[in-house]
């Protein structure tokens, strides 16, 4: 498991993210985060099936008025709000726990990567 790394010039991860539109979340400072990518994978684990959902969020200084058509994103599995519980765990409004895999900056873009593993009985 990757732990989040904080550099002196990096702000801390958002304390909470609230969904304001299908693909946009807003944090406690009014910064907007775009859902850039949602990855889903399934794998058998004993008598269970595990589903892993990984969400890539990027802080954008300007938000497009319409969702980008080139990459449709299914956000049905994402909570309407995440709250930071510890340095590497967010809790969703649906009671789910999401790991903070990455909080980094590349150029002017801040990025958050969160994931969750859901076990289903076969």
UniProtKB/Swiss-Prot annotation:
GO molecular function, one term: protein serine/threonine kinase activator activity
Pfam families, per the entry: TCL1_MTCP1 (PF01840)
InterPro entries attached to this UniProt entry: TCL1_MTCP1, TCL1_MTCP1_sf
Family: Belongs to the TCL1 family.
Protein known as: Protein TCL1B3
Source organism per UniProt: Mus musculus
């Amino acid at each position: 498991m990757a732990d989040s790394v904080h550099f002196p010039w990096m702000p801390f991860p958002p304390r909470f993210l609230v969904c304001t539109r299908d693909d946009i979340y807003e944090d406690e400072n009014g910064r907007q985060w775009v859902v850039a990518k949602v990855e889903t994978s399934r794998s058998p684990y004993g008598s269970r099936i595990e589903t892993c959902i990984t969400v890539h969020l990027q802080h954008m200084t300007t938000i497009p008025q319409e969702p980008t058509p080139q990459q449709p994103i299914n956000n049905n599995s994402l909570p309407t709000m995440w709250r930071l519980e510890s340095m590497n765990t967010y809790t969703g409004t649906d009671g789910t726990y999401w790991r903070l895999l990455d909080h980094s900056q590349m150029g002017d873009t801040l990025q958050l990567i969160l994931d969750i593993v859901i076990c289903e009985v076969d």
